[in-house]
A protein has these predicted regions:
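Sequence/structural signature of beta-propeller domains
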Residues: 2-5, 9, 17-324
Length: 324
């Protein structure tokens, strides 16, 4: 993910200008309905998706819990809840609200710190959680959800309970060992055929330019070609039947900020097919941010989540897309 300093120093001027025209995200402690289209922009979504609502999330919940640095989210069907993880080591539960098919609100339920084996909150680089995968979310039982959480900087994967307590020792996959500190296991989901699928944010050493790595814990690897926009990086995966949906962010100022949604069909390793479903570019007037999270709801709608890097010039956005 872009670090806070890079984000502050390199935001495209158009996005910076639009930011000054609306209330800052920290001005309230409730989610606000906003437009993903920039001020005065006369634009429509790409033809294969439609927008079904956008929220700007607060920097703190009403009880004072920080809500910045959000990295990923997962939908729990059993409870009808979203679980969100931050790169500051927080695990949040919240309930989205829809009216006439549009996302109009998000109500916080509770928040917990991710903890180590001694019960102490994770801090600093140890807390840099980037992706979240849910266990036991569709078995009809309430209260038994668990999570896989991937971390970068200290590249590892670990299982946690719903309150942030560790359930097993960390796993350090060899396929992520050569990743740059801030370019590790940014993407993760589970497929019935393969189990956990993880993706590195950017090309690891020795990879072809513009090509990063998807892998499983039992040793399968695929070569994933990133989208064409300059600076494209893989930020999340979610399951859609037997396929994957991939979220990419292209952040390379002064080039436009571009967010791409892509479909991935895994073949025999290392082969796969990738199809771009939709791209949103700041050059067209979309008021984008650092999109890092992706989850699929039961009816096929998608929720995208952005990481504000704890910057007053960025926003934590929750965006609803409906594939056509």
């Amino acid at each position: 993910m872009p670090t806070s300093g890079r984000a502050l120093g390199a935001l495209p001027l158009a996005i910076l200008f639009m930011t000054l025209l609306v209330p800052l995200p920290g001005c309230a402690n409730h989610a606000r309905v906003v437009s993903l289209a920039g001020v005065g922009a006369d634009i429509t979504p790409p033809p294969r998706v439609e927008l079904c609502g956008t929220l700007s999330l607060p920097s703190h919940w009403p009880d004072g819990t920080p809500v910045n640095g959000l990295s990923d989210l997962v939908w729990e069907r059993d409870a009808g809840l979203l679980h969100m993880v931050s790169d500051r080591g927080w695990l949040h539960r919240a309930r989205p609200r829809f009216e006439d098919g549009q996302l109009v609100g998000l109500s916080p339920i509770d928040s917990h710190r991710l903890r180590d084996g001694d019960g102490l909150p994770l801090e600093g680089s140890a807390a840099d959680a980037e992706s979240l995968s849910l266990l036991h979310g569709t078995n009809g039982k309430l209260g038994d959800s668990e999570f896989w959480v991937s971390f970068e900087r200290d590249h590892r994967l670990q299982r946690f309970d719903r309150d942030g307590g560790p359930l097993a020792a960390p796993i350090r996959p060899a396929q992520a060992a050569d990743a740059a500190p801030n370019k590790g296991m940014e993407a993760m989901t589970e497929l019935p055929k393969h189990g956990l699928i993880l993706g590195l944010e950017s090309p690891p050493p020795g990879a072809a330019p513009g090509e990063t790595r998807l892998f499983t814990l039992d040793g399968k690897q695929w070569r994933y070609p990133l989208a064409a926009p300059t600076g494209s990086a893989l930020t999340e995966l979610t399951a859609d039947g037997d396929d994957l949906l991939a979220l990419e962010r292209a952040f390379a100022p002064p080039a436009p900020l571009v967010i791409s949604l892509r479909r991935v069909r895994l073949g025999e390793p290392p082969e796969l097919d990738v199809e771009t479903l939709a791209s949103f570019s700041s050059a067209d007037g979309w008021w984008l941010d650092n999109m890092e999270g992706l989850t699929r709801l039961d009816d096929g709608r998608l929720l995208l989540l952005s990481d504000d890097n704890a910057s007053p010039l960025q926003r934590s956005l929750l965006v609803c897309l409906r594939p056509r």
